[in-house]
Amino acid sequence: MDSRRLQLQHATDLAEEQKGGVLVITEGVFGMKGDLGKLDEIVALKKDFQFRLLVDDAHGFGTMGEGGRGTASHFGVTDGVDVLFNTFAKSMAGIGAFVCGPRWLVNLLRYNMRSQLYAKSLPMPMVMGALKRLELIRNHPEYQQKLWEIVRALQNGLKENGFEIGVTNSPVTPVFMKGGIPEATNLIVDLRENHGIFCSIVIYPVIPKGELILRVIPTADHTL
């Protein structure tokens, strides 16, 4: 908290010098290691500093918080988030993304954002599919409950068997290992061909040489 306070004080001083404002950007769930952004602590700093908060909650939407509303809901600070970015590509298994915020901001982005101006609209089948998946997330909390049963079983099982999974607090389950590209290739082939497990693996240069992260993300459709 102290380091964030110092950073915000520095940003505030710079903003005053430049006659601008401060925008704090963070993730709800960090997609590589599964740990959560300290949204409750960041929102609490609004009492002492003037800033807007943008949260990229690509991995939290649909999995975290009441009814899958996301990481801000998980921390109980939804009203403290000014701009929320989410994607249809994770929990909703589609394509596209969306931004939530004040109407004036949404309209500003709609008519000025290059990626919006020079891109085609989503195909109607994808839009209808996204609406249906959103309906399922809203009306079937048992899917989220089942997901978390599987997440806890997977993560507890990995830890009990001596695997290092770090400090994840989300369905994103990293398994930290040592090795290079040959070991990574052999591992993912063995998992897929001999155990029926398909998952991605992270290697250098995304992480330091000699380290591997087996990135396992369970779904509500998996079985125990």
Where are these regions (language model features)?
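Conserved active-site segment immediately N-terminal to the catalytic lysine
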Residues: Q50, G70-F88, N107-Y111
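Short beta-strand
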Residues: V22, F85, A119-K120, E164-N169
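Conserved core segment of the aminotransferase class I/II
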Residues: V83-F85, M92-Q144
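Short, small-residue-enriched loops and turns at beta-alpha junctions
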Residues: R5-L6, V29-K33, G60-T63, Q116-L117, ...
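Active-site phosphate-binding strand-loop segment of PLP-dependent enzymes
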Residues: D2-L54, T219
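Conserved PLP-binding catalytic core of the aspartate aminotransferase-like
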Residues: H140, Q144-Q155, K159-H195, Y204-E211, ...
